[in-house]
Amino acid sequence: MSEPPRFEWHGPKAAANRAEHKVTFEEAATVFGDPLGRIAGDPRHSEGEQRYVLLGQSNRRRLLVVMFTERGEAIHLISARKATRREEREYEEGEA
């Protein structure tokens, strides 16, 4: 049995994300538990490190887009926001 992922983030960035997008990083971390979640690479924002985008449902039943990178054994959250209507359709149709 594998250990659950460990999450990390910068406090000021988490506060700014909450103010701008009304999504806490604590909620964003729960999206990683969505079995229907979709992860894609984010080459446009991957200068210096590989970044990824996760589209999935949180424990509050909100569909979120979470940007993250892997740092050692941890998942480093960069930002999180509510999915757009287009992203909602992609998720529902299994295209993300």
Can you annotate each of these PLM segments?
Residues M1-A96:
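Ribonuclease/tRNase effector modules and their secretory precursors
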